[in-house]
Amino acid sequence: MDFDLEPSLEELIKQDTLKWIFVGGKGGVGKTTTSSSIAVQLALQHPNDEFLLISTDPAHNLSDAFCQKFGKDARKVEGLSNLSCMEIDPEAAMSDLQQQAQQYNNDPNDPLKSIMNDMTGSIPGIDEALSFMEVLKHIKNQKVNESDDSTDKISYRTIIFDTAPTGHTLRFLQLPSTLQKLLGKFQQLSGKLGPMMSMLGGGGQGQQDMFAKLNEVQKNVEEVNEQFTNPDLTTFVCVCISEFLSLYETERMIQELMSYQMDVNSIVVNQLLFADDDENPCKRCVARWKMQKKYLDQMAELYEDYHLVKMPLLGSEIRGVENLKRFSKFLIKPYDPKVDRAIITEMKEQ
């Protein structure tokens, strides 16, 4: 059956089951603006619910986008009382991890402690792993079932991720299954290492506490893995620009996301010129728009069963809550250059 999906994210914004929304793509295509716009629209459309926007990109831009300083702890956005933001710092998380390891065992000669310290410094993708551990902290605050009526939780309806460029993001999303296997091996080792350490004079309460902590982490990882592969709970929004390399990267990302069994059915195309509807377009703009239209046509054919959202190029950066409110409307109601160009020109750089 041939049909075109609505070229907007209205369906995503209105979906009442989503707990996790990932926003990602190649570097420099407007991921932070898109993730911030999605978060703003969610907060506006559902004023009685709480939302959290997390940056897992080492080059944090949320503070710049909202003109407000954010850190490793969730902080309310000024002007949107039901939206909070946080920026995960992998280096700070690494320091915290090492301090926690010290608490479990103060014996510097314990061989197991030495192994753990070596591993935390040498695991490939450790930055993504530490970011993921921060996510695990927040899943405990997530109500997956409405029957969960606990009062000691901050219940976020949805958590939105402003992710790092494609390679980092794919490693991050692969972590639940990777950690699941790794922690399973640790559990197998714990049964063998415990008696062996006792014979060597090591072991004790510190190791028991460490393995108990690993048990808890494994359960959380399994829960996250189940949620990330459930299309009712999790979706991924691809962000790109209308150029060959960006289109190639988007296709590669979609194929990998599908291999992880993660839902993806929305693509946001940023920085479009719409020169056909400009009264006095420059020759360079017309030439570039011609190139953009060529790749837009390819995307329309390749992703006919996706929500393909077309967003305009602005003359200045989109900063501040008010500008994000204006710009994010085009995620819901498709941008019409004949009608909406005035709204774009009204946006002032902060």
Curated annotation (Swiss-Prot):
Keywords assigned by UniProt, alphabetized: ATP-binding, Cytoplasm, Endoplasmic reticulum, Golgi apparatus, Hydrolase, Metal-binding, Nucleotide-binding, Transport, Zinc
UniProt keyword annotation of ATP-binding present: yes
EC number: 3.6.-.-
GO cellular component terms attached to this protein's record: GET complex; Golgi apparatus
Major location (coarse): cytoplasm
Family to which this protein belongs: Belongs to the arsA ATPase family.
Task performed by this protein: ATPase required for the post-translational delivery of tail-anchored (TA) proteins to the endoplasmic reticulum. Recognizes and selectively binds the transmembrane domain of TA proteins in the cytosol. This complex then targets to the endoplasmic reticulum by membrane-bound receptors GET1 and GET2, where the tail-anchored protein is released for insertion. This process is regulated by ATP binding and hydrolysis. ATP binding drives the homodimer towards the closed dimer state, facilitating recognition of newly synthesized TA membrane proteins. ATP hydrolysis is required for insertion.
UniProt subunit comment: Homodimer. Component of the Golgi to ER traffic (GET) complex, which is composed of GET1, GET2 and GET3. Within the complex, GET1 and GET2 form a heterotetramer which is stabilized by phosphatidylinositol binding and which binds to the GET3 homodimer. Interacts with the chloride channel protein GEF1.
HAMAP family: Asna1_Get3 (MF_03112)
Protein name: ATPase GET3
Species of the source: Candida dubliniensis (strain CD36 / ATCC MYA-646 / CBS 7987 / NCPF 3949 / NRRL Y-17841) (Yeast)
Gene: GET3
